[in-house]
Swiss-Prot record:
Protein name: 2-isopropylmalate synthase
Subunit structure: Homodimer.
Residues covered by the Pyruvate carboxyltransferase domain: 6-277
Superkingdom of the organism of origin: Bacteria
Organism: Gloeobacter violaceus (strain ATCC 29082 / PCC 7421)
Signal peptide residue numbers: none
GO terms of molecular function: 2-isopropylmalate synthase activity; acetyl-CoA C-acetyltransferase activity; manganese ion binding
Pathway named in the protein's UniProt entry: Amino-acid biosynthesis; L-leucine biosynthesis; L-leucine from 3-methyl-2-oxobutanoate: step 1/4
Catalysis performed (reactions): 3-methyl-2-oxobutanoate + acetyl-CoA + H2O = (2S)-2-isopropylmalate + CoA + H(+)
Length: 538
């Protein structure tokens, strides 16, 4: 099936959430889905409906909230098993346009050691389950898992059977990120040349980044006939991650003259090669990073803090004279507004609200009031408040779960010599204020021990990191942490000019998520109802 543009299939909420420690609750998934819709993705893979009640709820809520007539296609993953497919069909039912994505392994190593089935059995199952899914929706995607290590001739026959049974998209996963661009491009070319009926389906690819080749392999696939790319925001995902949405989109945007002829267009065509609103890329990256607790490395292409920074004097001189000397894209193209309008302590609510709208944030009255109070507090501490600061405040104040425990006060005493001591005052779910103190190896350790004495939620702190929001001695610091309890991970995030305060708030943010998960196990995902399902991943 020929397409003159690329279909962007976003799997941040499914494969991306499989990143270690990237657990999201249903509210957070809906918030990300809303932003993905604003970003302009064609398909949102909202989850694996059969895996757990929490996954089912998240897929259903995304379908109901974002799956409008003019919104993206909402998809659920399903093994090639009737119960999986039925759950997927039920979960995506509220969407105006739904898709079932079913899969089964086709590599000999998977058939022998995981499925314990013959090639003939797997081929028959693939055809039967695609036909079964077709009974629920017209839009059915089929994936031969571990296609990259499957025997080509057998892979061709399985794809033929899936297309004959009604698959409208056939997705080729490099499940373990093993192939090189030349090999993967050759695999896609072989499919276009040897699979009967391939013209009736869209060829999709799903590349993992184990060797750092996910984007390169995806581009090679496009050159050889693929017209859908499965990707995630910030490239998050299982193990080393997936193909990065922002990198694949901007590669096509910046190198449009190279890719236009591949899509059957004149080389000088200025029509975008995807439906993505690139100005939403940076905001999408920040939101996913904030909600998953997965920091973006500074040198990450497109969205890293250093992506548009120049340290070399020669480079700086060239950029000052003409940005094109050392930059191949404009930062504003991806939503990084370099004309950072500065607000101060005399700026009023209307100016603050107006700037939020210009930055792409639309807050309700309650969120706006909290954010404005934080802004005024910050403006009293800093001479000027930049857009970077405002974005950090917004990320901090938009709460998708109830704030059961609220920080009222934190004081620390430390120095050399001396024993770091912290006093913490909290308000609990019952509205009662509690105070306690503790000593630790450092001020943050003392604060966390004091909080643990006040909140009896056993957990293991597995990650703590601090990043500067802006330059300067009065810069805000962003603290991101992760805690683990019973195999589940919860992230916390906070920003403040005082790192100790930010650390306390980040820890409470994570503990509030943990508290909410224990009180609402279905809403937050809870234990997997079908762990065998979640164990199989593209």
């Amino acid at each position: 099936m020929f397409q003159d543009r690329l279909i962007i299939f976003d799997t941040t909420l499914r494969d991306g959430e499989q990143s270690p420690g990237a657990t999201l609750n249903a509210d957070e998934k809906v918030e990300i889905a809303r932003q993905l819709a604003r970003l302009g993705v064609d398909v949102i893979e909202a989850g694996f409906a059969y895996a757990s009640p929490g996954d089912f709820e998240a897929v259903e809520r995304v379908a109901r909230t974002v799956g409008t007539e003019d919104g993206p296609v909402i998809c659920s993953l399903a093994r090639a098993i009737r119960s999986d497919i039925q759950a997927a069909a039920e979960a995506i039912r509220p969407a105006a346009r739904g898709r079932i994505h079913t899969f089964i392994s086709t590599s000999d190593i998977h058939l022998e050691h995981q499925l314990r089935k013959s090639r003939a059995e797997v081929l028959a199952i693939a055809a039967e389950m695609v036909a079964f899914a077709k009974g629920f929706v017209d839009d059915v995607e089929f994936s031969p898992m571990d296609a990259g290590r499957s025997a080509p001739e057998y892979l061709y026959r399985v794809l033929e059977a899936a297309i004959a049974a009604g698959a409208t998209t056939v997705n080729i996963p490099d499940t373990v990120g093993y192939l090189t661009p030349a090999e993967f491009g050759g695999l896609i070319r072989g499919i276009t040349q040897n699979v009967r009926g391939i013209e009736r389906a869209v060829i999709s690819v799903h590349c993992h980044n184990d060797l750092g080749l996910a984007v390169a392999n995806s581009l090679a696939a496009i050159e050889n006939g693929a017209r859908q790319i499965e990707c995630t925001v910030n490239g998050i995902g299982e193990r080393a991650g997936n193909c990065s949405l922002e990198e694949i989109v901007m590669a096509l945007h910046v190198r449009r003259q190279f890719f236009n002829p591949i899509f059957g267009r004149p080389a000088d065509s200025t029509v975008p090669l995807s439906t993505i609103d690139t100005r939403q890329i940076y905001k999408s990256s920040r939101l996913v990073s904030h909600l998953t607790g997965m920091l973006v490395q500074p040198n990450k292409a497109i969205v890293g803090a250093n992506a548009f920074a120049h340290e070399s004097g020669i480079h700086q001189d060239g950029v000052l004279k003409n940005r094109l000397t050392y930059e191949i894209m404009d930062a504003e193209t991806v939503g990084v507004n370099e004309n950072r309008i500065v607000l101060g302590k005399h700026s009023g609510r209307n100016a603050f609200r107006t700037r939020l709208v210009e930055l792409g944030y639309e807050l309700g009255d309650a969120d706006l009031n909290r954010a404005f109070l934080r802004f005024k507090e910050l403006a009293d501490k800093k001479k000027t408040v930049s857009d970077w600061d405002i974005e950090a405040v917004i990320s901090d104040e938009i709460r998708l779960i109830p704030e059961a425990y609220r920080l009222e006060q934190v004081q620390v005493s430390c120095g050399e010599p001396g024993l770091p001591t912290a006093t913490v005052r909290l308000t609990g779910p019952d509205g009662v204020e509690r105070v306690d103190a503790a000593v630790g190896t450092g001020p943050v350790d003392a604060v966390y021990k004091a909080i643990n004495r006040l909140i009896e939620l056993p957990n293991e702190l597995i990650e703590f990191s601090v990043q500067s929001v802006t330059a300067g001695i009065d810069a805000m610091g962003e603290v991101t942490i992760r805690v683990r309890q019973d195999g589940r991970t919860f992230s916390g995030h906070a920003a403040n000019t005082d790192i100790i305060v930010a650390s306390a708030r980040a820890y409470l943010n994570a503990l509030n998520k943990l508290h909410f998960a224990l009180a609402h196990p279905t809403h937050s995902g809870g234990a997997l109802a079908h762990p065998d399902a979640a164990a199989q991943k593209l």
